[in-house]
Amino acid sequence: MRTLRVADLEAKPGEKVSGFVHIIGAEFGIPVTLICGEKEGETVLISGGVHNAEYVGIQAAMQLADELDPKKIAGNIIVIRLMNRTGFEHRTMSLTYEDGKNLNRVFPGNPNGTLSDRIAYTVVTEFFPKADYYVDLHCGDGSVSYTHLTL
């Protein structure tokens, strides 16, 4: 029987499991949902919150994780609900709070680097090998001027 595993999280066919994947040297993990479809198929990795102030991507990732039914899915879906957790909690726009780095620019990361480097390293080593496809959700954030879009 095929089981979807990422770090310490595990979902069997027809199951949805949520939890946290630990970041090396951090006291927290990143929130993740594993959706293991009842039927065989490929695996899609979806991430929200690489840029912590891109709220639409974060909300979309959370809604997808909550609403998708594993009994109606062929293959697997891995959802990183919020990759840059501390940046989100401290409202630092698009940077990681602890090191001031743009998480999207440090991939593939470094297990001995700053928090941003270690988050990127965890995603590259724990998530990427499981995925056939990767969708990284982005949108405008607080630094975008919406005046030209307003009637």
Model-derived features with residue positions:
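Structured catalytic-domain cores with a bias toward divalent-metal coordination
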Residues: 1-151
